[in-house]
Amino acid sequence: MTDFAPLTLETPAEHPFAPFVRILGKGKRGARNLTREEAREAMGMLLDEKVEDTQLGAFLMLLRHKEESPEELAGFTEAVRERLHAPALKVDIDWPTYAGKKRHLPWFLLAAKCLAQNGVRILMHGGGAHTAGRLYTEQLLESLQIPLCRNWQQVETAFEHGNLAFIPLGDWAPQLQRMIDLRNTLGLRSPIHSLARLLNPLNARCGLQSIFHPGYQGVHRDASGLLGDTVIVVKGDGGEIEINPDTISHLYGSTGGESWDEEWPALAAQRHVKPASLEPEQLKALWRGEVEDSYPQLALIATMALALRGLGHPREQAFELAQQYWDARDKSI
């Protein structure tokens, strides 16, 4: 005899998170953006693990399809920051590194090392190797002697010894890391990849952000402006914070909530040929002065200048300082 499920005679109560999914997914005419307050509440429920997995997937993919608004990103960021238990450490630059590189080596890592040698305190954070065929910061930390920190105390110690630290996202926002890790389950990157770039967990003086896809740079700048943050957003090479010297670079800035724009000319007369393959040992060779190569030196000098611009130096002065720092670097590694 077959046992049948009982009939549903009463309408089940709606899940508290359901309205947020409905707002985003209610058809072409019925759907709308979340307000900043709604975004803060929705992200708070995600972080507090008060949603079903099906709701999480639906929410992330609806956002991905729609594209996040500045108000949504600001609200999401506020929810994350409210739940952080980070110490009050003095930091100059927040340097998110989530994209990975595939066309050029991550020369920006040498830029960060050189800045740190000159007293610029930098926090780097990333979300691991989520996409095949890319070279990620986490894979190079040991060889480049960038401290891998697993808690804020280790970050503080690293700052005291060398002004540079990397901490994985999963060690200070595990729920966000879980969402990023859905990349290969859902088949698409989620909006968390974008959100992570805004978080600036230690409230650094300036947050650098790289957004590769056209049109998104202004959205991120506007979101940071709503938060009152000081940031520079660029279209960095491969989605990482690295100036491409072969192209014009547009800087989308926000200082204390006030927007500004700046355009930097290309640094090379003609485009460089991309390497046939990525050889990480070339990073150390360039640092040690064993090889000379136009592209990486232009890229890392300009990237250092970008960080210095974020700390208030005018462009020309930032480039002069960056060149001085690079020429005088401690080449041991």
Predicted regions and their residues:
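Acidic, glycine/proline-rich low-complexity segments that act as flexible tails and inter-domain linkers
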Residues: 2-104, 116-122, 269, 283-292, ...
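Residue-level signal for inorganic ion chemistry
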Residues: 59, 141, 196, 304
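A generic, well-ordered mixed alpha/beta core segment in the N-terminal half of proteins
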Residues: 90-157
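Glycine- and other small-residue-rich loops at beta-strand/loop junctions that grip anionic moieties
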Residues: 100, 125-127, 168-171, 209-213
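General beta-strand structural signal in soluble alpha/beta enzymes
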Residues: 122-126, 148-151, 166-168, 192-193, ...
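Phosphate/diphosphate-binding glycine-rich loops and adjacent basic-rich segments that engage nucleotide
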Residues: 150-210
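A structural signal for small-residue-enriched, beta-sheet-centric alpha/beta enzyme cores
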Residues: 186-289, 293-297
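Short, small-residue alpha-helix embedded
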Residues: 300-311
